């Protein structure tokens, strides 16, 4: 047991991805008027809650991870950290994260962190992941919470932009997750996890991917239509979304579904990263805020 093992069970890669989306939501709401104290609270608080959820997920999925090639060497599967200690660690991380958001951001940001945690750990990890093909859809809601937390940390309100972020990031999760399920098909089948490719086939999954990317593309444009993001953001969102849709369409003619799915997965990360960056820098400044800057 070492510090490295405690870091590994928090899934740092997932935390980093969520930091980008928290920052995107925060800077979109800030419109250039940044409170760095609140920003740090939003980023660190969300990271702690996400880390907590990942540790709990590792605890819950020990039996599944034993049956999957890519996860059978995880820390808890190998017994490098005890279950009791991991559960205590996860609890401390979660409580600390929510407390930080509540005290240094606002109660609404903390509430969305709790909602995301409950969905991911309670609904998805404990129940739906093992029992329903719709587990991915429910789990996508938890993955969409970080940008909403970042946004609400600034505004302390759930408005059209916050709703758009929730819808955008939920829709993005679906083709992203389905791509993983395709190129990790054998692992999911061996672990008896009822993801869409395993339950209904890869062709059906490709159709779902197309529909979700199309819906995601439309949702991304709503930030500009609603007056929250600028035209540069719109251009990037439209371009990335349409190319992602084109890549999905090419899947119908793919010779190797595994190779195609990996490419689709990688581009999904590029897409959401680009949009998080663009909404951070190409926001719409209201007349009221311009007056604030002027004086």
Swiss-Prot record:
UniProt keyword annotations, A-Z: Cell inner membrane, Cell membrane, Heme biosynthesis, Membrane, Transferase, Transmembrane, Transmembrane helix
Its membrane topology: Multi-pass membrane protein
Gene Ontology CC annotations of this record: plasma membrane
InterPro entries recorded: Protohaem_IX_farnesylTrfase, UbiA_prenyltransferase, UbiA_prenylTrfase_CS, UbiA_sf
Enzyme kind, highest EC tier: transferase
Listed GO biological process terms: heme O biosynthetic process
Pathway: Porphyrin-containing compound metabolism; heme O biosynthesis; heme O from protoheme: step 1/1
Annotated catalysed reactions: heme b + (2E,6E)-farnesyl diphosphate + H2O = Fe(II)-heme o + diphosphate
Pfam family, one: UbiA
Protein localization: Cell inner membrane
GO molecular function, one term: protoheme IX farnesyltransferase activity
Principal subcellular localisation of the protein: membrane
Enzyme nomenclature, EC number: 2.5.1.141
Family statement drawn from the similarity comment of this UniProt entry: Belongs to the UbiA prenyltransferase family. Protoheme IX farnesyltransferase subfamily.
Role description: Converts heme B (protoheme IX) to heme O by substitution of the vinyl group on carbon 2 of heme B porphyrin ring with a hydroxyethyl farnesyl side group.
Note: Carbon 2 of the heme B porphyrin ring is defined according to the Fischer nomenclature.
Protein name, UniProt field: Protoheme IX farnesyltransferase
The species this protein was found in: Pseudomonas savastanoi pv. phaseolicola (strain 1448A / Race 6)
The gene coding this protein: cyoE
